[in-house]
UniProtKB/Swiss-Prot annotation:
InterPro entries in the record: Pup_ligase, Pup_ligase/deamidase
List of catalytic residues: D57
Entry keyword annotation includes Magnesium: yes
Catalyses which reaction(s): ATP + [prokaryotic ubiquitin-like protein]-L-glutamate + [protein]-L-lysine = ADP + phosphate + N(6)-([prokaryotic ubiquitin-like protein]-gamma-L-glutamyl)-[protein]-L-lysine
NCBIfam families, alphabetized: pupylate_PafA
Phylogenetic placement of the source organism: Bacteria, Bacillati, Actinomycetota, Actinomycetes, Mycobacteriales
GO biological processes: modification-dependent protein catabolic process; proteasomal protein catabolic process; protein pupylation
UniProt cross-references to HAMAP family, sorted A to Z: Pup_ligase
Similarity-based family: Belongs to the Pup ligase/Pup deamidase family. Pup-conjugating enzyme subfamily.
Residues reported to bind Mg(2+): E9, Y55, E63
Protein's name in the database: Pup--protein ligase
Short name of any one Pfam family annotated for the protein: Pup_ligase
Length: 452
């Protein structure tokens, strides 16, 4: 499948610092955040004009699920648009607090762990064909996902009883199973719950929940692009070396703690391989595969960055990727800070900086400041991101959903939508079922809109 439907779901961490004596719980802060949403959507679970879903998830975490995208840059742009949507809610909620005499600054973090050790996720969705064995896909994909922190981890300072240590991944310490149908209780690497949001006879949705939330656009593109390409190669019958892991959960933690990528992890049958060995195999197959694949500039950019990052890990010289890979950008920032102020990695100010890197408020968040200074690469523009806040992807089913929502809101009509249904809540209860996520034009939807 060379054209694939993809999406990213991001849960955001919430906290608030108060200026006066009045305090609010995280639940109350989250309700302030969503008050504007509830006022027009009559719910804290809504679909937006850009085709995305916005809702309040378990544990007071706002969650933004991008609309269906069919290109990498489109997906990165819509992922960033989610940050802008949440930032707008943040600014509105702070104003509401001020109007009610509760002075406070609300912080939304696009990260995966809080100070209490709780974890929240960034889930990737990939449409795959129903034909073929799902177990083959998961068997080949699992070693790739366990070791890809080397190329797309967000980085984290982990405080241990002995000392502070810099890790590749925020999420690695919180994953407890390889493949499972649960998402919250056991936190697997691949979630097998079969909800395709499409024609179930043709498709299923691969739900990857092991990834870190990335601030860097190029890291997001590498994370999603490399996984999509590995899936495409599996579907095309490309043969990979068998890197079945003896214990994926132990391996994911070991990989996260080794910035050199050279520490051996145990494979099934007593063999060993390093994260670098495993990633090199997938990368080498990708380079070969591209030679016969239909040209695609975005995929070629992904494979180029993938190779440069593996070279950087191998040589431990990160100069050629230090504006493109989250954990590398973050580690360089910490090292400069430590050198300038003569402090240890365990210093609370470093942990504060770690958190501030993920603050989505422009002008305050550290990543935003790095980006403005040219210390973090761009692959999209502010104008494209702003457009994606209100405009759905024009090449997928999201266009139909977005146009229906816009028309219904402008006509003052009551409606219900989900990923596959568009429904007018009138006497006739007219509903259109959109089972093909690749389809952006549908006469039935046009007629439904025209009838408003």
């Amino acid at each position: 499948m060379q054209r694939r439907i993809m999406g990213i779901e991001t849960e955001f961490g919430v906290t608030c610092t108060f200026h006066g004596h009045r305090r609010l719980s995280p639940d109350e802060v989250a309700r302030y955040l969503f008050r504007r949403v509830v006022s027009w959507g009559r719910s804290s679970n809504v679909f937006l004009r850009n085709g995305a879903r916005l809702y309040l998830d378990v544990g007071s975490h706002p969650e933004y699920a991008t609309a269906e995208c069919d290109s990498l840059i489109q997906l990165v742009t819509h992922d960033r648009a989610g940050e802008r949507v949440l930032e707008d809610l943040l600014i509105d909620a702070e104003q509401r607090l001020a109007d009610e005499g509760i002075g406070g600054d609300i912080y939304l973090f696009k990260n995966n762990t809080d100070s209490a050790g709780n974890s929240y996720g960034c889930h990737e969705n990939y449409l795959i064909v129903r034909a073929g064995e799902f177990s083959r896909i998961s068997d080949v994909l699992l070693p790739f996902l366990v070791t890809r922190q080397l190329i797309c981890g967000a980085g984290k300072v982990l405080q241990t009883p002995k000392a502070a240590t810099f890790c590749l991944s925020q999420r690695a310490e919180h994953i407890w199973e390889g493949v499972s149908s649960a998402t919250t209780r056991s936190r697997p690497i691949i979630n097998t719950r079969d909800e395709p949001h499409a024609d179930a006879e043709k498709y299923r949705r691969l739900h990857v929940i092991v990834g870190d939330s990335n601030m860097s656009e190029s890291t997001t593109m590498l994370k999603v692009g490399s996984a999509s390409l590995v899936l495409e190669m599996i579907e095309a019958g490309v043969a990979f070396r068998d890197f079945s892991l003896d214990n994926p959960i132990r391996a994911i933690r070991e990989v996260s703690h080794d910035l050199t990528g050279r520490r051996p992890v145990r494979l099934a049958g007593g063999r060993q391989a390093s994260a670098l060995d495993i990633q090199r195999e997938y990368y080498a197959r990708a380079v070969e595969y591209l030679q016969s694949r239909e040209p695609n500039t975005q995929i070629e950019q992904v494979v180029d960055l993938w190779g440069r990052q593996l070279d950087a890990v191998e040589s431990q010289d990160f100069a050629k990727v230090d504006t493109e890979i989250d954990w590398v950008i973050k580690r360089k920032l910490f090292q400069r800070y430590q050198d300038r102020y003569n402090m240890e990695l365990s210093d609370p100010k470093i942990s504060q900086l770690d958190l501030a890197y993920h603050d989505i408020k422009r002008g305050r968040g550290v990543f935003d400041l790095l980006q403005r200074k040219g210390l973090a690469a761009r692959i999209t523009t502010d104008e494209e991101i702003e457009a994606a806040v209100n405009t759905p992807p024009q090449t997928t089913r999201a266009k139909l959903r977005g146009e229906f929502i816009s028309a219904a809101q402008e006509a003052g009509r009551d409606f219900t939508v989900d990923w596959v249904h568009l429904k007018l809540n009138d006497q006739a209860q007219r509903t259109v079922l959109c089972k093909d996520p690749f389809r952006s034009v549908d006469e039935r939807v046009k007629r439904l809109i025209a009838s408003m």
